[in-house]
């Protein structure tokens, strides 16, 4: 009698592309030995739209609506980096009031991004309830955005030298009310999630990254701070008016998925502290630098000639980017979002290189999931927090 032999071939499984409402159009080719992950190969590019090349054929103001499609859950940060680069090239000063408004909008956007990370992350590991809770607070933030900018998601609010419009009457009081309410919401999340034994079983000790390893991989944001590295560009680069406020860099030393969760939960509380201080200390004055208008090149345009005088026209403001290069970065919710800009005495950038945090943080995924269980892939991928719009650009 012949004994049947057991086949030991690896199983190759396609995970994704996922729906954009979850982790985006990311495809993972996973090699499995039973439930154990042997190899994982991410396939990118499904959402590539040529954002860098588009930037080289647009003025800064024309390009501003495009950038909100990178990380479409934290659009204030993509607008901020797009505006900060030409501001530094032209040495343009931002009024105090505008700087305070920017900080408020950035921190509200950080909270909204972390909330929409928390809900799907919990759904990935089997907890559906928080997915609905986070939308309650997120809608309140979007109501504030809509009142100030007119848009709930793609705001198009930042401008070179300031912001597009001042805060409407009563907005500051509504925002302060939201801050008081949201602090109780964070406490509720921590009671529900942080000490939940089922949650801890899924995330504790899963996807561990050491501090030196995180630096070598070029990780940033909560991925880096959860590995024991106290690095936050708001403290390091002193941009906008963050130095005027009292807040702490949130970090953990364990480096696992639980540590990354704790960092993001703590960051939401710190963002509320920053917003409250910015609202209470917001000065009067202009919300934009009116001197920027003297840099406008459209007054010399042929469209201002005699024969075009009866045509109604409202050109977008443009000015030349001087012939130099610089790298500008901000601390986005997912990590270091940077722009390498090269000017060429033209209204168009000669080179516009995007440094997306999600793309670089994603590179460590294959190493983290090796020798883990299949179910741990979604836990680790969720803890990285990626948006494919900025990964593929």
Curated annotation (Swiss-Prot):
Main location: plastid
Cytoplasm keyword on record: no
Molecular function via GO: NAD binding; oxidoreductase activity, acting on NAD(P)H, quinone or similar compound as acceptor; quinone binding
Keywords: Chloroplast, Membrane, NAD, NADP, Plastid, Plastoquinone, Quinone, Thylakoid, Translocase, Transport
EC number annotated for this UniProt entry: 7.1.1.-
Matching SUPFAM superfamilies: HydB/Nqo4-like
Membrane disposition: Peripheral membrane protein
Cell compartment(s), UniProt: Plastid, Chloroplast thylakoid membrane
Family: Belongs to the complex I 49 kDa subunit family.
Protein name: NAD(P)H-quinone oxidoreductase subunit H, chloroplastic
Highest classification ranks of the organism: Eukaryota, Viridiplantae, Streptophyta, Embryophyta, Tracheophyta
């Amino acid at each position: 009698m012949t004994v049947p032999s057991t086949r030991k071939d690896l199983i190759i499984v396609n995970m994704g592309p996922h729906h954009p409402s979850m982790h985006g159009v990311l495809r993972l080719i996973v090699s499995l030995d039973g439930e154990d992950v042997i190899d994982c190969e991410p396939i990118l590019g499904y959402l590539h739209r040529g954002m860098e090349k588009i930037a080289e054929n647009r003025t800064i103001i024309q390009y501003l609506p495009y950038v909100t499609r990178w990380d479409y859950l934290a659009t204030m940060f993509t607008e901020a980096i797009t505006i900060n680069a030409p501001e530094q090239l032209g040495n343009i000063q931002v009024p105090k009031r505008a700087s305070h408004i920017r900080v408020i909008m950035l921190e509200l956007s950080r909270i909204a991004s972390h909330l929409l990370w928390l809900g799907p992350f919990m759904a990935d590991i089997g907890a559906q309830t928080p997915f609905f809770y986070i939308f309650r607070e997120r809608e309140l933030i979007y109501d504030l955005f809509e009142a100030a900018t007119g848009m709930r998601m793609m705001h198009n609010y930042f401008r070179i030298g300031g912001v597009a419009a001042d805060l409407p009457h009563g907005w500051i009081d509504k925002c302060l009310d939201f801050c008081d309410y949201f602090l109780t919401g964070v406490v509720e999340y921590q009671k529900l999630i942080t000490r939940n034994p089922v949650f801890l079983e899924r995330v504790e000790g899963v996807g561990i990254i050491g501090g030196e390893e995180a630096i070598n991989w070029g990780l940033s944001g909560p991925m880096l701070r959860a590995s024991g590295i106290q690095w936050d560009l708001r403290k390091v680069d002193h941009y906008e008016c963050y130095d005027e406020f009292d807040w702490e860099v949130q970090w953990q030393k364990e480096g696992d998925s639980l540590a990354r969760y704790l960092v993001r939960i703590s960051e939401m509380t710190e963002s509320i502290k920053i917003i409250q201080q910015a609202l209470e200390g917001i000065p009067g004055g202009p919300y934009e630098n009116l001197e920027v208008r003297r840099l406008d090149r459209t007054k010399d345009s042929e469209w201002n000639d005699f024969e075009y005088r009866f045509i109604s026209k409202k050109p977008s403001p443009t000015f030349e980017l001087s012939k130099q290069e610089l790298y500008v970065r901000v601390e986005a919710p997912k990590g270091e979002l940077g722009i390498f800009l090269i000017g060429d005495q033209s209204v168009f950038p000669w080179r516009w290189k995007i440094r997306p945090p999600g793309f670089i943080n994603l590179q460590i995924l294959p190493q983290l999931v090796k020798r883990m269980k299949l179910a741990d892939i979604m836990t680790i991928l969720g803890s990285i927090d990626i948006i494919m719009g900025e990964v593929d650009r």
